[in-house]
Amino acid sequence: QSTIDVFETRSNQFGKEILDDYFEQVHRKEKYSINDLLIIRLYLEHIRDRDTDATIYHYFSSLVTHLPNQQEVMDSKELFILRDVILISIGILGDREDYEKIPSLFDALDKIMFLTQDFQKKPILNLLKWKYELHVNKNRDAAQSYFEEATLFAKLIGNDYLVHKIKEDWEEDSRL
């Protein structure tokens, strides 16, 4: 509930006590439980779209380095939360133009989707990959391939609205 409150109100007061009490413990761990992931997700909502000082961003950055390996040690039922935490992390890294860690997160998401056989977020993952290829690697051909795959997966899951939004986003990115 705290995560939803933070997201809806853009106030970082919701869940602050939880973070104050538990985040340092989570930060020191090598393997995360489902509760740890929920605390991390709350933390990510606290720092998303906000200016953060170097210490807070350092905590985030060190957490991100542990995320790709978590899919190997977690129960398959918990991978959906890990997937969402990784997607949010990619957004934060991209917004801060901190691109170095993103490829390993992409790889982890691909593995999670394969292990769970849940491809609902595959169009979004491919959208992020095309943006990475276009803006970071300056590789238009690879970006085009990810765009086509994103569109295909959105059609396969029957989400016409998502197909439309993906095409709109591609048109905007293509103008750059």
Where are each of the predicted segments found?
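Alpha-solenoid helical repeat architecture
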Residues: 1, 28-41, 54, 70-85, ...
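Alpha-helical repeat scaffolds
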Residues: 11-27, 52-70, 98-112, 139-151
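Alpha-helical adaptor scaffolds
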Residues: 48-49, 53, 71-121, 132, ...
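C-terminal non-catalytic interaction modules
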Residues: 126-127, 131-176
